[in-house]
Amino acid sequence: MTQAEEPRLERVVVLEGGISSEREVSLLSGRGVKEALASKALEVESWDPAVDSVGGLEEGAYDAAFIALHGTLGEDGSVQGLLNCIGLPYTGPGVTASAIAMDKELTKNIWRANGISVPAGVRLTAAASDAELERAIAEFGADGVVVKPGHDGSSIGVTKLDRDALSLHSLRAALNAAAERDAAEVLVEEYIHGREFTVAILDGKALPVIEICAPEGSYDFQNKYYTDVVRYECPAKLPEASAKALAAACEKAFAVLGCRGWSRVDALERADGTFALLEINTSPGMTPHSLVPMAARAVGLSYADLCLRVLGLARTDIA
């Protein structure tokens, strides 16, 4: 795969910005996508749901929409439903798959039911009792826990507590921090102290596996987007059989959720060499630090051609 087939599109709208905590990242992604598509002689405009009216989408006479929104509205099925109603083809998964993927616990349950390994954990709220927290520590805290919002992305609101730092007090503080991002649902999961990987899926097929080598395992929001301290290995230095197994698991994870177009799946390696899948990103970042473009480059696909490939897969849920 070295060349992107240019879709027969002339007028495209890039959806960017939005109202989520990932707004600034979305604007960075949108800027890159707009420049790339314009370089391919497409007429490109932008639409920001935080400031622009729905009428602008309806009246734009666009051939397709490239969704560069992240988080609420952009990845939860909301904007996908709107675009279905308008009849405007869009990039990425449809309404149902997007809504499911936004819910980390529901996603894990579906994956687990389909034989895909995921971290053990429990879903709580900020109102969880001390007894519930103590039970979570007893059941999942042998090596520490990871506390995260049930629906947010970009590692926002995530706290990692290793075994020495884990206590009722520290878990309560982490729970409250995550609940500030997602009052409805917080996940407390086992802390898997292993290598971190991500796999981009394009049209149902995995691109080369990327290993994320963050300082002290801290692949947080700041390190993801605003520093150069994280090192990446692409393709990851894994035995061939392990890389194939991880890629196959991620392709299956994409398929069983009913995804289409593109996505990115995050995973951790367990001590026994197997992998636990963490979550799926249905509108992956396209910033200068983003990982899908990195994986695409490894197979000879430029940023601009990647944008065209993704755009060429634009669909609606309505036949």
Residues covered by each model-derived region:
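ATP-dependent carboxylate activation and anion-phosphoryl transfer catalytic cores
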Residues: 2-7, 113-115, 239-319
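Short beta-strand-to-turn element immediately C-terminal to the catalytic PLP-Schiff-base lysine
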Residues: 124, 158-165, 201-203, 270, ...
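ATP-binding N-terminal substructure of ATP-dependent carboxylate-amine bond-forming enzymes
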Residues: 1-109, 113, 124-135, 312-319
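A short glycine-rich, hydrophobically flanked beta-strand micro-motif that places a catalytic Asp/Glu
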Residues: 45-50, 186-190, 260-272
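Short, flexible, mixed-charge acidic loops at enzyme active sites
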Residues: 78-85, 218-226, 282
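Active-site nucleotide/adenylate-binding loops and adjacent lid/helix of ATP-dependent enzymes
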Residues: 2-16, 44, 100-187, 193-194
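Phosphate-binding site of ATP-dependent enzymes
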Residues: 168-248, 269-276
